[in-house]
Amino acid sequence: MILKLSKTKKMPCKSLSFPANKEVCKGMIDYVTKEMKDVCKGCYAKKGFYHMPNGKINRQDNYTLSKQDNFVETMIKEINNDLYFRWFDSGDIYSQEFLEKVLEVCKLTPTTNHWIPTKSRELFNQETWVLLEALPNVK
């Protein structure tokens, strides 16, 4: 299994893709109403080319690899010289442990500008988010 970063047409940089499901996109559910958030109802990662079999396999493999101990090192090798990197053209931060890995990657790639679109901001440790968002290379 090999980490495969995606390159979407509308973005000038590589991106990490995970499956867009409840296991990964924990922020898609409003925990008060138990309903899917409106912003997630039209998720582009659930239509179009995102349904192609190879893409689905790659996103699942990326998710599996993100749980391994060497994920941080793998990501650093993949993006270290890039000017920009977008986390998640599909998927999201799914656990505190993964959030900490994202923080490490961002710290160790200071010349890369990281964009981290997320719907999971309120679900994990706020101190970790503050550390991540304080980095000068994180948007």
Description of each model-found segment:
Residues M1-K139:
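Class I S-adenosyl-L-methionine
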